[in-house]
């Protein structure tokens, strides 16, 4: 299918429904198979995502109930590196990131791949960044959208969600926005070119930590209502807001995994 169509489906799958607040909850498998539906990914894409779904099933069995997102990224990217020997690293990384994002955000792959209803379902785990589940969810959602749609759309979706949170949710959070933008950068680096895709795999293989892919969020304002946000930053085109974005981008640019 067209990359733009896939990007839209990924955005709908990951962003349309409020994310779970505790450990990832995987719904029980239906007892009666659903009526056949058209798979929206190609057979090759479906097979790749299935491989990483199975990888998650096995990996989480060895993880504690609450653990850093890195503990799942490492085995998935190791699998991607192995599979890339017979294919394109960009395709393998994209499928790995998509399967990861769907799992971490507690969604169902059936939105994208109806036949996945019969696939093994991984046990639930609470994946975190800086000990926060919401940052892991933001990071992986933006990584998947960035890997399929590119930075502008991923950044726009992340900003739209924060503005909506300011109006009626948990409040505008620059920490969440930092996770969004770091995730977008990760997704782009993993899928932009073959050299960058393989380089990322190699960096993760040689030793990996949260501090290499996710910036510190200390000092980034959070939980701002729409009124609070407007009083402090006036709007998303103000110098005050731009300075905050510049600070976030500075922190991301300094992360080791994104260095050339």
Where are these regions (language model features)?
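Intrinsically disordered, low-complexity, mixed-charge
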Residues: 2-156, 166-177, 181-260
């Amino acid at each position: 299918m067209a990359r733009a169509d896939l990007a839209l489906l990924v955005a709908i799958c990951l962003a349309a429904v409020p994310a779970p607040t505790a450990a990832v909850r995987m719904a029980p498998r239906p007892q009666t198979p659903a009526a056949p539906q058209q798979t929206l990914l190609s057979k090759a894409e479906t097979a790749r995502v299935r491989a990483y779904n199975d990888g998650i099933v096995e990996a989480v069995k060895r993880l504690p109930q609450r653990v850093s997102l890195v503990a799942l990224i490492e085995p998935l990217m190791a699998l991607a590196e192995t599979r890339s020997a017979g294919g394109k690293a960009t395709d393998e990384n994209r499928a790995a990131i998509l399967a990861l994002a769907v799992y971490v955000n507690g969604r169902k792959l059936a939105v994208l791949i109806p036949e996945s209803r019969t696939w093994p379902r991984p046990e639930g785990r609470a994946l975190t960044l800086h000990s926060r589940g919401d940052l892991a969810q933001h990071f992986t959602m933006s990584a998947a959208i960035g890997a399929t749609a590119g930075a502008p759309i991923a950044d726009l979706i992340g900003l739209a969600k924060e503005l909506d949170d300011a109006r009626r949710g948990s409040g505008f959070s620059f920490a969440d926005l930092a996770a969004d933008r770091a995730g977008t950068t990760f997704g782009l680096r993993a899928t932009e070119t073959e050299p960058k895709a393989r380089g990322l795999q190699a960096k993760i293989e040689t030793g990996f930590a949260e501090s290499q892919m996710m910036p510190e969020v200390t000092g980034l304002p959070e939980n701002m209502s729409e009124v609070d946000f407007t009083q402090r930053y006036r709007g998303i085109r103000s110098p005050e807001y731009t300075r905050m974005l510049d600070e976030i981008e500075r922190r991301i640019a300094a992360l080791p995994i994104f260095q050339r």
